[in-house]
């Protein structure tokens, strides 16, 4: 008993030390953000306010890394295409590169889209709205990460600005038409992600997994799937990211994507042909072909995420910085280049937040919603980029977080559907077997079928293996070869996994309202502090 208590104490002590180290590193980063604002900020007499804003922006960036980046690498980690440590390293590097290389476009503050500019034309009020929105979004992301719910960082910031804007100028100031698009994205994003992921999963099952000669089918089909992913990724990066560096028209975008896709097809075709002698005609062996594409997908998604979502942390901070620097500039609608020091705060904060607190949400997306193999993870990654690309071309409001999580749920629901079909198929097989056997061994056959129906996946495998080896048992002699094959097919298609749908959907629905409430309260609190302190 004493030894057990000592071990538990040592375990708790190690966890405390680990948590303390994480907090210390986070505090050091926030101090670094404050120093950057002090050294490079040009806020004149309002230097302390800019330092405070930089600390809040850094805190927001860390929460984005801890919560939102899980969508990019979760499926790859859950399918074991890459280790947790490897995923964090790749994602952290690519997030920083994306933020610094392609995230510094001319920034137009979100404020102009959520609250009408004419209602907030005072620089002092505008700065308080931005501070309240940043802090409210960061606090909600922190809570969502603690409870294990991946939520949209964009919606968190939108809610914060909406709440602070209403507290500053009333409900009339809110752009309700823009917010209706946010509400629509709650349905559009996960639904599109789920449907596209389900389509590609069924395509892979029909063209590879359900074939007798899986190996030959995979050697033919997989290079085309990887080429399609290359086309969509290259097009996505051009449309969503690289246009910030150099604008290209639609025809050139498509041509560049097709050229890259053709090149990747040729290279990957050679890769699979070289790997062919090592492959077996099994699902597990074919899965290995998706390893490399998944790693590249995680890296590219992280790069794109760093370029896009870093604005949620640095957009309000950049707006505050510019307002403090030039009091005569038009409030909230001025376009300004983001200072490099602000880009560094955003990029480093996302990378640090991912490294310290990202594994929890990575596990949630990668394995807790549903078990994923590499084929399924590939479908999720492909669905994510296709959905974002389609939505951007159609002008639909979507959230990358909702898309990826929706795709994971879609894969899980499809597997549940296949499981139900397997059960119905098993019921028909069972009835046919029982009807075909009228001997003294009927009771034993019925008992075997009942045990098979109730067994889990591993137990079914053992029962089929035992049935195969036991040539002299009554059941083995009575069951025909076709009947045994039917049972084996039912076993292979059945998958059991619980989901956490309710918690995540609830978190999605309350993100904007909770962030708005926090934003309003924090705006009022900032005004109170300024007035009395």
Swiss-Prot record:
Q: Where in the cell is it found?
A: Cell membrane
InterPro entries reported for this sequence: Phos_transporter
Enumerate the UniProt keywords alphabetically.
Cell membrane, Membrane, Phosphate transport, Transmembrane, Transmembrane helix, Transport
Tell me if RNA-binding is a UniProt keyword of this record: no
Query: In the UniProt record, which is one GO cellular component term?
Result: plasma membrane
Q: Which residues cross the membrane?
A: 23-43, 47-67, 81-101, 129-149, 156-176, 182-202, 221-241, 248-268, 286-306, 338-358, 372-392, 509-529
Give the bilayer topology.
Multi-pass membrane protein
Gene Ontology biological process:
phosphate ion transmembrane transport
Q: Which residues form a coiled coil?
A: none
Top-level taxonomic group: Bacteria
Asked if the keyword Transmembrane helix belongs to this entry, the reply reads: yes
Question: One Pfam annotation, family name?
Answer: PHO4
- Signal peptide coordinates: none
One GO MF annotation is: phosphate transmembrane transporter activity
To which protein family does this belong? Answer: Belongs to the inorganic phosphate transporter (PiT) (TC 2.A.20) family.
Function recorded in the entry: Potential transporter for phosphate.
User: What is the protein named?
Assistant: Putative phosphate permease HP_1491
Species in which this protein is naturally found: Helicobacter pylori (strain ATCC 700392 / 26695)
């Amino acid at each position: 008993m004493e030894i057990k208590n000592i071990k538990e104490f040592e375990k708790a002590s190690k966890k405390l030390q680990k948590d303390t180290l994480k907090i210390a590193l986070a505090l050091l980063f926030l101090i670094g953000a404050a120093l950057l604002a002090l050294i490079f900020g040009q806020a004149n007499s309002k230097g302390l306010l800019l330092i405070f804003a930089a600390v809040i922006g850094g805190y927001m960036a860390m929460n984005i890394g801890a919560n939102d980046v899980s969508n990019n690498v979760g499926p790859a980690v859950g399918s074991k295409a890459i280790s947790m440590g490897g995923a964090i390293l790749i994602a952290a590097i690519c997030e920083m590169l994306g933020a610094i290389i392609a995230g510094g476009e001319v920034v137009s503050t979100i404020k102009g889209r959520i609250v009408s500019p004419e209602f907030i034309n005072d620089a002092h009020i505008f700065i308080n709205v931005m501070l309240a929105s940043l802090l409210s979004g960061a606090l909600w992301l922190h809570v969502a990460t603690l409870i294990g719910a991946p939520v949209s960082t964009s919606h968190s910031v939108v809610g914060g600005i909406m709440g602070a804007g209403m507290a500053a100028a009333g409900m009339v100031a809110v752009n309700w038409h823009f917010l209706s698009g946010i509400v629509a994205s709650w349905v559009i994003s996960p639904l599109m992600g789920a449907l596209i992921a389900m389509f590609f999963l069924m395509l892979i099952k029909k063209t590879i997994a359900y074939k007798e000669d899986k190996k030959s089918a995979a050697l033919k089909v997989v290079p085309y799937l990887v080429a399609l992913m290359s086309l969509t990724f290259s097009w996505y990066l051009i449309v969503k990211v690289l246009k910030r560096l150099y604008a290209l028209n639609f025809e050139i975008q498509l041509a560049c994507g097709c050229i890259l896709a053709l090149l990747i097809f040729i290279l990957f075709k050679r890769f699979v042909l070289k790997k062919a002698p090592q492959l077996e005609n099994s699902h597990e062996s074919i899965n290995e072909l998706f390893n490399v594409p998944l790693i590249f997908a995680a890296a590219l998604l992280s790069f794109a995420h760093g370029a896009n979502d870093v604005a949620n942390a640095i957009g309000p901070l950049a707006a505050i910085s510019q307002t403090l620097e030039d009091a005569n500039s038009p409030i909230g609608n001025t376009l300004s280049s983001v200072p490099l020091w602000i880009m560094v705060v955003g990029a480093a904060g996302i990378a640090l937040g991912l490294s310290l607190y990202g594994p929890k949400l990575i596990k949630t997306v990668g394995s807790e919603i549903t078990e994923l193999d590499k084929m399924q993870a590939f479908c999720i990654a492909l669905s994510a980029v296709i959905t974002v690309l389609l939505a951007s071309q159609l002008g639909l409001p979507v959230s990358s977080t909702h898309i990826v999580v929706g795709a994971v749920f879609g894969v899980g629901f499809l597997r549940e559907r296949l499981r139900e079909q397997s059960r119905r198929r098993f019921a028909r097989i069972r009835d046919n077997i029982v009807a075909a056997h009228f001997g003294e061994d009927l009771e034993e056959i019925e008992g075997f079928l009942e045990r098979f129906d109730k067994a889990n996946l591993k137990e079914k495998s053992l029962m089929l293996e035992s049935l195969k080896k036991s040539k002299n048992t009554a059941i083995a002699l009575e069951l025909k070869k076709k009947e045994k094959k039917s049972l084996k097919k039912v076993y292979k298609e059945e998958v059991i996994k619980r989901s956490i749908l309710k918690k995540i959907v609830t978190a999605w629905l309350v993100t904007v309202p909770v962030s708005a409430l926090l934003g309003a309260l924090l705006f009022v609190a900032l005004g109170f502090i300024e007035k009395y302190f």
